[in-house]
């Protein structure tokens, strides 16, 4: 079981795209420029949302993840930007992969979400 769910791969992770490929899911990004790292004091506790990236701290693009459990090894290493404030029971039920990249054959999909400032 993984400690987080990652999404936002608009190149290989979009099942409506001709580039869709579960073996490559999590390695693609968007055509927009990468984001510079913005590390904060937000701890990567259960429900925290953070930007996914490659080994380069300044490589965050379209992908983000939601932490299922405390992951202090991510603190001040990944740009946390939010937290689930309602519906954590839905997050707890997200399918968890056990493959090399953690993908699942029939991934759960975000149907709708709201942001709050």
Identify the role of each PLM range.
Residues 1-117:
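Cyclophilin-like peptidyl-prolyl cis-trans isomerases
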